[in-house]
Amino acid sequence: MCGIVGFIGEQDAKEILLKGLEKLEYRGYDSAGIAVQAENGVVVYKEKGRIAKLREIVDENVAASVGIGHTRWATHGVPSKVNAHPHQSTSKRFTLVHNGVIENYELVKKEYLQDVTFVSETDTEVIVQLMEQQVSTGLSVEEAFRNTLSLLHGSYAIGLLDAENPNMIYVAKNKSPLLVGVGDNFNVVASDAMAMLQVTDQFIELMDKEIVIVTKESITIKNLQGETIERAPFTAELDASDIEKGTYPHFMLKEIDEQPLVIRNIIQKYQDENGEIELNQDIRNAILDSDRIYIIACGTSYHAGLVGKQFIEKFAKMPVEVHVASEFSYNMPLLTERPFFIYISQSGETADSRAVLVQTNEMGHKALTITNVPGSTLSREADYTLPLYAGPEIAVASTKAYTAQLAVLSILAADIAKAKGEVLDFDLTHELGLVANAMIELCDQKEEMDALAKQFLATTRNCFFIGRSVDFYVGLEGALKLKEISYIQAEGFAGGELKHGTIALIENGTPVIALATQEHVNLGIRGNVKEVVARGANPCIISMKGLEMEGDSFVLPTVHEALAPLVAVIPLQLISYYAALHRECDVDKPRNLAKSVTVE
């Protein structure tokens, strides 16, 4: 959700900034802009829409080796050129980009900036105007920056240019991700490392309420008290090819195809030298010392948590609750005496989940983060981390991170079960290997998936997914994928709930996708299909081999029933992908959505 880049050195800043913003497109945005320190002052370029439009207006003849850039996802003010970043103070001395939400911006305007004429509707403009007001009182730029930040309540990642000090960038963060990259006679700023892999793989993590002064030769980190902090850089373990589509038309299709490799990678990472599942002893002990597990997540990660609940309760016989993070923060349930929290987040930056983690940390409860970004905020602030090892996921709609979450949750459940003396009736590592094989088989059946999408979804306005037991949870994820990228109104329901209201929406031709992978509820879901067919529905039944019946639309290769969700979701991902193509939707960057949701 939004992205920041900055560059200071001797090279052409404009092109580096534009390329950096292109690498941040996956985070979601509705407008973009850059500002560069040119010979005659700061020059700002910004546009509503795609970065390609921004490129068209950037003057190639303007020489600049210092600049900042931004992709905006609207929170305050409509998507527009005026509301796009960078924003400038009235005198144009200060130019600023900002990710996050300033919660008290209206109070700041009223108390400090009554005489200022604002150009935009954004909370961000308040910061840059406040900066100018603070300098006007006689403070140095650094003192004014520190004072400005002390008056703000909320989240921010900030890059600031000062026209009177053109050889530096001022940077600060609080509750919003930001890195500083280290180069040879240059330095960079970025919301995440992928943006600046083009020039460096050395980055320094910034902590909340730190101020950084960046020049081409130095990086000076200070706290709000002005004390200097030393911190060594880390090497970003990313390959530039990981964030390229290669021969694929879309990142989403590439990431769907990468899932078998991801599962095998997870097996390898979580095996000991004897090929046995082995997790950190401290994680195991903390969970065993608890009396209930609480899984906190949003969106796709929440759906993974629902399946994870099944894994843990069935394998390890421990009670689990799953909560939507945004609801948990404001309506915390009664907790048991010894709760253990699991936070699931692809990015590790999800603001709603972090808000809960802050609360539970203050209460003294242990927490584990399951994330694709081990150095992320959630990872740093939780007690333990289990990485997904899925590699960068660029498409906004999550695919490989979801199945990676399921695989890691199954491994966690099996490890706890083993520690408790619970015996599984199958070898998890072997069965996960079979899951990877089944995924390969499914990914090779794209023509069949395309045909199903064309038959059931190409022209429909709505669609329902039904399932029982764990298939219900997979159906929720299938519905989310479809609505995210094809803009079809799609909903997932428990099969048994149809007659309690939803069946009123069924009419002639309504597509209903039914999942049948669980033997103990197979007859039940078949009965639900008959109910909707009797009302005119157009059923698409996806069943597991051995449970199939005449008329099923697609039969999945056999895997262990407990791990069926990892396989059953693949056709749903592919059907959603092809439905979006048939409807000429932007698959990788669907409207109004952001990959990393860093504001509450």
Swiss-Prot record:
It catalyses: D-fructose 6-phosphate + L-glutamine = D-glucosamine 6-phosphate + L-glutamate. It is found in: Cytoplasm. Its main location: cytoplasm. GO terms for biological process: carbohydrate metabolic process; fructose 6-phosphate metabolic process; protein N-linked glycosylation; UDP-N-acetylglucosamine metabolic process. CDD domains: GFAT, SIS_GlmS_GlmD_1, SIS_GlmS_GlmD_2. Residues 2-217 form the Glutamine amidotransferase type-2 domain. The active site is at C2 (nucleophile), K595 (for fru-6p isomerization activity). It is an enzyme of class 2 (transferase). Residues 283-422, 452-590 form the SIS domain. The keyword Cell membrane does not apply. It comes from the Bacteria. The keyword Nuclease does not apply. Pfam families: GATase_6, SIS. Keywords: Aminotransferase, Cytoplasm, Glutamine amidotransferase, Repeat, Transferase. One of its GO terms (molecular function) is glutamine-fructose-6-phosphate transaminase (isomerizing) activity. One of its GO terms (cellular component) is cytosol. Its EC number is 2.6.1.16. Catalyzes the first step in hexosamine metabolism, converting fructose-6P into glucosamine-6P using glutamine as a nitrogen source. HAMAP family: GlmS. Homodimer. This is Glutamine--fructose-6-phosphate aminotransferase [isomerizing]. The lineage of its organism: Bacteria, Bacillati, Bacillota, Bacilli, Bacillales. The gene is glmS.
